[in-house]
């Protein structure tokens, strides 16, 4: 059992399951639980109210519904006793200010290789493309006719398993049976 501050709205676990981030907009903070030690590890104070957390292989991306910035927390730094550094990167110029945020819609998603993320800024009608380690967007997509309220990426690529010449992908089959793969 671990106590976190009042006002927590969501919690997300990193891909390895070591760290659980508890989003607390009222406190303008993210509480980080160390599951290996079964205790609250630290509280990361933020300048803006956090609303969502997404994990790449290197960073936790913290989205703020009321800010034009993203906060990044380096996962490998969490095991150190010192405070985890928070990187602030721009997400456009205009602040979303929560006006267009809808429950159930995630305003960001991981890239298929987990080396970055895409993030929607509905006020600017832009989806920004981030690569881990960069301090600004790598690119952007303008959605001229509509406000991007959420982002979902579908990965339909093949990946080579090592250098074996064997490729693999993940698919979903609706029914059991025998399938011919051309």
Predicted segments, located by residue:
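Predominantly soluble domains enriched in secretory-pathway, periplasmic, or organellar proteins
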Residues: 1-182
């Amino acid at each position: 059992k671990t106590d976190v501050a009042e006002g927590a709205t969501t919690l997300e676990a990193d891909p390895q399951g070591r760290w659980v981030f508890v989003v607390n907009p009222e406190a303008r903070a993210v509480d980080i639980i160390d599951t290996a030690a079964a205790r609250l590890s630290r509280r990361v104070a933020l300048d803006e109210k956090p609303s969502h957390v997404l994990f790449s292989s290197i960073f936790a991306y913290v989205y703020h519904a009321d800010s034009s910035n993203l906060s990044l927390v380096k996962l490998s730094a969490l095991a150190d006793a010192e405070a985890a550094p928070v990187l602030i990167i721009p997400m456009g110029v205009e602040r979303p200010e929560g006006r267009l945020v809808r429950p159930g819609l995630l305003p960001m998603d991981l890239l298929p290789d987990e080396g970055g993320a895409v993030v929607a800024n509905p006020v600017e009608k832009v989806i920004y493309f981030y690569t881990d380690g960069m301090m600004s967007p790598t690119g952007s997509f303008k959605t001229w006719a509509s406000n991007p309220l959420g982002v979902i990426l579908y990965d339909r690529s093949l990946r080579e398993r090592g250098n074996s010449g064997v490729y693999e992908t993940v698919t979903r089959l609706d029914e059991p049976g025998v399938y011919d793969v051309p």
